[in-house]
Structures are given as structure tokens and as C-alpha cells.
Amino acid sequence: MRHRRSGQRRLSVRAILSHTLAISLGVLVTVGGLQARPSLAQAAPVEIAQATPANTAAPNSNPDSFVAAAVRQIGPAVVRIDTERTVTRRAAPMFDDPFFREFFGSDFFGNVNPPARQEVQRGQGSGFVVDGNGLIMTNAHVVANADQVRVTLRDGREFTGRVRGADSVTDLALVEVDTKGERLPTARIGNSSNVEVGDWAIAIGNPLGLDNTVTLGIVSSLGRRSSAVGIPDKRLDFIQTDAVINPGNSGGPLVNSRGEVIGINTAIRQAPGAGIGFAIPVNTAKQIETQLLKNGKVSHSYLGVQLLSLTPQMARDNNRDPNSTVRLPEVQGVLIMGVQRNAPAATAGLRRGDVVIATDGQAVTTADEFQRRVEASQVGQSLNLSVIRDGNRQQIAVRTGELQAG
């Protein structure tokens, strides 16, 4: 989180910031979306023709193919989600451009108020049915700010949807459709806690406007923190996969060899020649689903601090640096790099340069570990932090606040 620059003690740029790596590879939210988030690149609106839905069970398909069996299991429950929103734009944006106003002078434009025009922005993503009465799981960014939501099943049935609830922090949303009493095919939900690196991973969705597309890969890694993926405004540990995921896959299921949902396809990290996909673990999605159904929103705890994992070697490097104006304890812990004004951490008296070594008596060694403990707490819960400040150990109680999504 950002903090104001002040005359406070500065930490050694060479010793500390050299350990902080800014991720330069692009992260793409996999949808032809409606609204671009500052840290995420989005695909252009979909304008290509849709492919004819493919048959899922060819009569002479290989009966020993676990992929075909998994697709037969999950396929009917996977949906395409089309969204629209109307935005109003000025016909001549140059009227508001500071460059043109400075070049021509404000008097040149006078009080001219250019006419506004409306545009319809379209996006597309995927989802899957979690309740046969018409409840669908998808990504929050797929349906963000949508005026209209249309859900299409593989069998061609179409429904008008409404967003039942969304949580931008975990990028999950529920869409509800009126089935007029019809039961929809539902996805079989697996257990992401049982997933292991090397397991088969099958991604199903509507990438690039091509309906019912299936790709195969493996689970490449588990517990990839959103900050490591390049999405710092999310609070997630992702399943990483090499199953091909493209724009339009967002919100669709990542399934195991039995056709059970283990994750929700959310993002890709692009690199020359290949891409890496990331899915939200389905166990996380189930927890969010419960809160969205109950409250229509999800509450997240926060402290309002900027953190850096500290090692004894990093502290020694800092302390040897003649340009450093602060000495750090040579311990394993979490260095507070900044404190947000008026945040719970500031209210409790935490300061830049404090080193947290334990929470509620349990040692903490990395920033991610500390962040997970904060996220696991209830809003308003008091956390007892063991902190080293100016070489002295002290206890500071801080009460978590509720993170405001934005």
C-alpha cells in the first residue's frame, strides 16, 4: 500500500530495495472485459464470429481417454457469459486534454460543451453452474459494471442473468438466472486441498469467442501468491497450470482427470513463446460463495502496512551500508516499509522500520505468512504483535479493520 514520503529515517536503498523485485511480465485477466483494472491488461472486445458448439461425445472417441470422460462429466455445466454496458463519452475528448488547452489557450475553446455520445462495450467470459436452480460461478471482472448479462449453455439455451454478488478482492462472483423451473446441469466440485503438483489439469471455456474449448496440461505449482503473479490488488493463492488459458476463459473451470472442478481460471502471465495460467482454488471459491449468498458481499481484514520479508543477511547488508541511516535487527521477520495513514496499523502505533517477529505468540518469518494470518482473522479481531523497534522488543495490539474494495 502506498505511504506518504516524509522526513522519517530512510532505509538503505542498496541493501533493502535491491531485494524487492518488480514483476515486469504482463498479467492478463482472461476475458474480453468491460473495465480495465490499473494493474491488469485486458483483451479487446470480442468481435469475431462464434464457433458452432462442438459435439462432446463422438461415437467413435477413444473409450480409454480420461480427458473425453472428464469433458463429458463437466461439459454440460460450463457456460458462456456475454456482457454489455453503456458508457457515455464526449465526441471530442481533446476539449479536456491539458495539452490542447495549453497549446491553443483556454480562450480558444471558450465555453464549448461538445455533445456526448453513448457506446456499448461488450465482453465475454466463462462460468459453470454450481446449483441447478440457476446459480453460476465466474470471475468478478467478467461481470464488473455490466448493465446486461447473458448466459448461454452448451445445449444452446440462453438466460438473462443478474449478478447475485461479487468480491473484487478475490475476483469471484455469482450470477443468477431464472430457469423457469428447469434444472440446469451442475458441475461436480472437487477438493483443491487434495491437488498435487503434476496432477492432470483440464481447462474448459470459451477463449477468444470459441465455444466449448478444451485444453490439457498439468498442475505446475500450488500456492502462488497473487503478489508473485503480478496482481497485487488481489488476495489469493493460485493454482498454476500449463493448460492453455486465453482471453474468454476467465471464470471457467479447471478440472481434474475425473471432471471435478479444482479451480476457476482467472489469469495468465505472458512470456515469449508460452503462457502460464492461474486458477483460484475451488475451496477458496466455496468459502466466498457461502458469504456472497448470505451477505451479498465478503468482508476482508486488513492492517494498512507495506511489508518486506527480512532475513538476517539482508539486515547485515543494510547495517554495513554507510548510506543506511537505520540499523535493523539481524533476525528473520517482517519489516514494515510503510504505514497507511489512518489505517488500523497507524492507530495501533506501528511505524515504518518496525520488524514483526511473531503474531499471537507464533513466529512469523515472511511477509506472505504475515499477510495470510491477517486475512484469516475476523474484521475487528485484535492481533498481538511481537515487534522489534530500535533494538528493543515490545508487544503491540492491533485491531484489524475492514478492507474497502476499490
From Swiss-Prot:
InterPro entries: HhoA_HhoB_HtrA-like, PDZ, PDZ_sf, Peptidase_S1_PA, Peptidase_S1_PA_chymotrypsin, Peptidase_S1C. It holds the Pfam family PDZ_2. GO terms for molecular function: serine-type endopeptidase activity. The active site is at H141 (charge relay system), D171 (charge relay system), S250 (charge relay system). Keywords: Hydrolase, Protease, Serine protease. Residues 289-391 form the PDZ domain. It comes from the Bacteria. The keyword Hydrolase applies. PROSITE patterns: PDZ (PS50106). Transmembrane segments: none annotated. Its EC number is 3.4.21.-. It is an enzyme of class 3 (hydrolase). GO terms for biological process: proteolysis. Belongs to the peptidase S1C family. This is Uncharacterized serine protease syc0938_d. It comes from Synechococcus sp. (strain ATCC 27144 / PCC 6301 / SAUG 1402/1).
